[in-house]
From Swiss-Prot:
Domain of life where this protein originates: Eukaryota
Protein purpose: Palmitoyltransferase specific for VAC8. Palmitoylates VAC8 at one or more of its N-terminal cysteine residues, which is required for its proper membrane localization.
Organism: Eremothecium gossypii (strain ATCC 10895 / CBS 109.51 / FGSC 9923 / NRRL Y-1056) (Yeast)
Protein known as: Palmitoyltransferase PFA3
EC number: 2.3.1.225
Amino acid sequence: MHICSLIPILFPKLLTCGLALYSAVVLWLKVSVIGSFIQGTVLLTLVPLILYAYFSTIAVGPGSPLDFEELRIRDLNDVETGMEFPPDFLAAKTVTLDSTGRHRYCVKCKVWKPDRCHHCSACDKCYLRRDHHCVWFPGCIGYNNHKFFLHFLLYASVYAFWICIITTWDLVVWFRAHSYERELLNVHLVCLWALSAAATVALTAFCAFNIYLVCKNETTGEYQRRSTLNSDLEMYADCTNGPRTVIENPFDLGSRRRNWAAVMGDTWKEWLLPIRTTASQKARHSFDESGLYFKIDEQAHAKLAESMALQARLITRFNSKRAVQ
């Protein structure tokens, strides 16, 4: 039973390493249409980057509110009765509340949930800015490892496309030279061509979709729950008696460049290499750039701030009435 439980964990890692190394060996030994210097440069650049980004995604992890002692709930009963509250630094900058207007918390993890934090049923744990659960790694993609995950997709897409082009070129040359009259077609080359063609289509499409989401500063989960976010904004508008403004994503910073930088960093070096962003390194001794709170659309922020102030006054009045009674 113990061995069976390790299969979902070890199989994706072994398969990823196996495919990367197998493709590199076949390209080096069987493809002859391109010089060894170029071939070696590409292989020695992309394969290590792919494996490094892959294992960095796993090692770094998505990040969890459980990593912060300040977010742990002491008594769930006190939370439910309104006797225990989230820390001030979190409450002051949180914009997404539950349907009752209270700060979100997780009963299973016994922790206060920051904006964009969600509980994964597969991992049975809350993760910061959770994007999705990916069996390929295996685990969740979240705030801390999202950048490494996207780097893996970018490197793997380029590598698959390179293999597809080179193997196609080699096969075309082989057929045009009528080599089939003298020798059999190499089965490893054909298999690699088929795998690379399929991987190019799948990885490029998935990579493009994730880049699209990053440029909108939106996670996969938020993309699916967009209607819920709009409902929250409508609720805030109702509380303030203001006009209803529909904003597709309140975390959209207004430009693709700013949204991209929020995840991938500000410089070309950060965009191209699987390294931590400069902003996260500078703020490593504070709660900034830790996935606990985020910049949001200014219009949405103003409206949400008004609604939160109103909700605070209403809660105070409600508690005062209860105390009198």
